[in-house]
């Protein structure tokens, strides 16, 4: 592959993985299997490793999770809620053990093993023993404030046995018996049932009415101590024992293992015992027990090096494939999906499974009428593993992908170096609808309340056909749609109006220009500052910008060399949509009259004059970056009253420390 082709593929993989992360971690509505996600991630990691010049800070390969919903207030975690690396077999566990021992130079190590609860990760904050705030994991950096819903969980103490200030992490879950009862009630009421206990727990905690969560009989296991003031903890097992003494519910099935053989035995034991539990688990978490060794091993941007999650193999069942359905995405990619005779897999009824592309169908020789093996990778997303050839009768029908789009009947093409078939008709209704869904999404124009269901209704009612049509919607039109009342219609009109003020990069990303992801959109917006400047740019000018390759430059020029696009931009202007970049330019950071420009800052302790969130906003507005933990890259620690371990770490590493008074003096310069 040429460098341009490599860069193009990397951008496509990043966009794809960001979408998958958003669907899985934020919407609780995954669209692909773990296996497909892992294949794409491994391809991205391989390409980035071989082409380090294309590695970016916001690549899914170094980032945790995806974006946060706007239903609840946003909460920035004091320290990131990192995800864990995965192990799928004994060899992966032994590799983990080898890496750990190499990282600590042969020092004796012991592990602590815990059941991996399949629920919703949450963070709980206590001040002087009182529960003051609880939040979801979100994207690992920012979560949602769900304090009132968490207070309904009886396993969460509202007051601890000691007046300590701390932050703990845990997993909120729904017991199996509660899940069965809830779905029976929903079926009786004619309501849609939850797919699994994890979705039920997540859905319950995202209800705006705490009374609903209170009826759901949720529970929670605390699995870690993120921060504590005035106490030194030397091991993870000590932390769990201490948390149990404070009144938290910790899982009793944890075990200290002196060797990796003992770890493997523990994994095998609980793989057998798993069905006997009254809650879902999807694996085993293995951690280095000693905190000092954890610190020596450190973390990557995505996960700690001292812990790993062993994922149980997925349950496999056999069912009949009755048909293949096609869907068209916003870029014209046509994706086949298997239609199955309903079968129960990992606790839920499965009727459909992704087949990904024509090559996979051909490689696995999948035919209509075949009996196929189906599993839920990660116990979540259905996929066809293989065909049961012994069950073939000769009546099965070979499947051939169509030559024309199933939506608009235009001819399909396979572009060079792609496995997917594409519809290249820009007027294809399916592409327009999917493009509209992308335009309003979180990383684009971020219009709250305008999701896939509403877009589909608006599209089918012929109220919208272009992005600009959204800004001409009226409350009266919305009131004609299903499930819209006066308040919801007014709220959506206000949300659409508010999106006009977005910075240029969101609009550029929302337009869906081929090869232009969220990062490239920001780079373009920052460089050109206005839409008009970008529209006038030539290919050579674009290629001169760092991170903009030849393929992307060609795509941008081609996109804006279209009368329909220019008309769309004029419509945006007529509706008052912002066309300028509102962020701080990197080139201007050095001119900001502030110490903070380009610096990494950590806030700790209580600030009297302003809260930490306000201080964070001020620092970031002045070009600084605020993180939740002290590291070698930290330039400054601002310490308020009752500053804890972060202050001690700063002193240990000779990092500059300010009190609040010094901080305020700098702000007032």
Swiss-Prot record:
Q: Where does Zn(2+) bind?
A: 405, 408, 423, 428
This protein's cofactor list reads: Mg(2+); Mn(2+)
InterPro entries, sorted: BRCT_dom, BRCT_dom_sf, DisA/LigA_HHH, DNA_ligase, DNA_ligase_AS, DNA_ligase_CS, DNAligase_adenylation, DNAligase_N
Question: A cellular component term (GO) from this record?
Answer: cytosol
Keywords assigned: DNA damage, DNA repair, DNA replication, Ligase, Magnesium, Manganese, Metal-binding, NAD, Zinc
Which GO MF terms does the UniProt record name?
A: DNA binding; DNA ligase (NAD+) activity; metal ion binding
Q: What class of enzyme is it?
A: ligase
Instruction: Please give the PROSITE patterns that the UniProt record associates with this protein.
Output: BRCT (PS50172), DNA_LIGASE_N1 (PS01055), DNA_LIGASE_N2 (PS01056)
Cited SUPFAM superfamilies: BRCT domain, DNA ligase/mRNA capping enzyme, catalytic domain, Nucleic acid-binding proteins, RuvA domain 2-like
Residues that, per the record, bind NAD(+):
34-38, 83-84, 114, 137, 171, 287, 311
Q: What are the GO BP annotations of this UniProt entry?
A: DNA repair; DNA replication
- Identify the EC number(s): 6.5.1.2
Keyword Glycosyltransferase set for record: no
Q: Which residues form the BRCT domain?
A: 591-669
Q: Which SMART domains match?
A: BRCT, HhH1, LIGANc
Coiled-coil features, chain-numbered ranges:
none
Q: Give the active-site positions.
A: 116
What catalytic activity does the UniProt entry give for this protein?
A: NAD(+) + (deoxyribonucleotide)n-3'-hydroxyl + 5'-phospho-(deoxyribonucleotide)m = (deoxyribonucleotide)n+m + AMP + beta-nicotinamide D-nucleotide
Give the protein's function.
DNA ligase that catalyzes the formation of phosphodiester linkages between 5'-phosphoryl and 3'-hydroxyl groups in double-stranded DNA using NAD as a coenzyme and as the energy source for the reaction. It is essential for DNA replication and repair of damaged DNA.
Query: Of which family is this protein a member?
Result: Belongs to the NAD-dependent DNA ligase family. LigA subfamily.
Question: What name does UniProt use for this protein?
Answer: DNA ligase
Please tell me the species this chain comes from. Answer: Bacillus cytotoxicus (strain DSM 22905 / CIP 110041 / 391-98 / NVH 391-98)
């Amino acid at each position: 592959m040429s460098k341009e082709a490599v860069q193009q593929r990397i951008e496509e993989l990043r966009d794809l993985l960001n979408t998958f992360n958003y669907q899985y971690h934020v919407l609780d509505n995954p669209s692909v299997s773990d296996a497909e996600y892992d294949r794409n991630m491994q391809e991205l990691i391989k390409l980035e490793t071989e082409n380090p010049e294309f590695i970016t800070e916001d690549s899914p390969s170094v980032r945790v999770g995806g974006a946060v919903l706007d239903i609840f207030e946003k909460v920035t975690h004091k320290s990131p809620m990192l995800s864990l690396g995965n192990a799928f077999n004994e060899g992966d566990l032994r590799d983990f053990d080898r890496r750990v021992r190499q990282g600590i130079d042969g020092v004796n190590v012991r592990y602590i093993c815990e059941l991996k609860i399949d629920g919703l990760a949450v963070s709980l904050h206590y001040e002087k023993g009182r529960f003051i705030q609880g939040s979801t994991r979100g994207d690992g950096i920012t979560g949602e404030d769900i304090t009132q819903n968490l207070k309904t969980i009886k396993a969460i103490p509202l007051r601890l046995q000691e007046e300590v200030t701390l932050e703990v992490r845990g997993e909120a879950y729904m017991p199996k018996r509660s899940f069965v009862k809830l779905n029976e009630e929903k079926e009786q009421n004619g309501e849609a049932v939850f797919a699994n206990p994890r979705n039920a727990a997540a859905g319950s905690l995202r209800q705006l009415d705490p009374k609903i969560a209170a009826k759901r009989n949720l529970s929670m296991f605390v699995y870690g101590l993120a921060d504590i003031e005035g106490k030194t903890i030397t091991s993870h097992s000590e932390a769990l024992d201490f948390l149990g003494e404070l009144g938290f519910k910790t899982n009793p099935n944890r075990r200290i293992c002196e060797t990796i053989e003992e770890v493997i035995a523990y994994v095998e034991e609980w793989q057998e015992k798993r069905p006997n539990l009254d809650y879902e688990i999807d694996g085993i978490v293995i951690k280095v027990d000693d905190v000092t060794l954890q610190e020596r091993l450190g973390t990557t941007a995505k996960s700690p090096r001292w812990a790993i999650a062993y994922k149980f193999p997925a349950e496999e069942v056999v069912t009949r494939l009755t048909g293949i359905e096609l869907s068209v995405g916003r870029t014209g990619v046509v994706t086949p999906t298997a239609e199955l005779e309903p079968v129960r897999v990992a606790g839920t009824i499965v009727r459909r499974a992704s087949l990904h592309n024509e090559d996979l169908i051909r490689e696995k020789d999948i035919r209509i009428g075949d009996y196929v093996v189906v599993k839920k990778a990660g116990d979540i997303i259905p996929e066809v593993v293989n065909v049961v050839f012994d069950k073939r009768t000769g009546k099965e029908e070979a499947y051939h992908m169509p030559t024309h789009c199933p939506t608009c009947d235009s001819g399909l093409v396979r572009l060079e170096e792609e496995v997917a078939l594409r519809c290249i008709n820009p007027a294809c209704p399916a592409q327009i609808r999917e493009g509209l869904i992308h335009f309003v999404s979180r990383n684009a124009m971020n219009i709250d309340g305008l999701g896939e269901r509403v877009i589909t209704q608006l599209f089918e009612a012929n109220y919208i056909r272009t992005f600009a049509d959204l800004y001409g919607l009226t409350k009266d039109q919305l009131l004609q749609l299903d499930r819209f009342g006066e308040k919801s219609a007014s709220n959506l009109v206000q949300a659409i109006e508010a999106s006009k003020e977005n910075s240029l990069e969101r609009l550029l990303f929302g337009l869906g220009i081929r090869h232009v992801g969220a990062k490239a959109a920001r780079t373009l917006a920052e460089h050109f500052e206005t839409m008009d400047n970008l529209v006038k740019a030539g290919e050579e000018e674009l290629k001169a910008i760092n991170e903009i390759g030849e393929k992307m430059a060609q795509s941008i020029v081609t996109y804006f060399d279209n009368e329909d696009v220019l008309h769309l931009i004029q419509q945006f202007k007529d509706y008052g949509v912002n066309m300028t970049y509102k962020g701080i330019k990197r080139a201007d950071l050095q001119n900001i009259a502030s110490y903070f420009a380009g610096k990494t800052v950590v806030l700790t302790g209580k600030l009297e004059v302003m809260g930490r969130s306000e201080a964070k906003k001020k620092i970031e507005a002045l070009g600084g970056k605020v993180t939740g933990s002290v590291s070698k890259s930290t330039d400054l620690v601002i310490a308020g009253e009752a500053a804890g371990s972060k202050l001690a770490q700063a002193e240990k590493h000779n990092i500059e420390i300010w009190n609040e008074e010094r901080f305020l003096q700098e702000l007032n310069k």
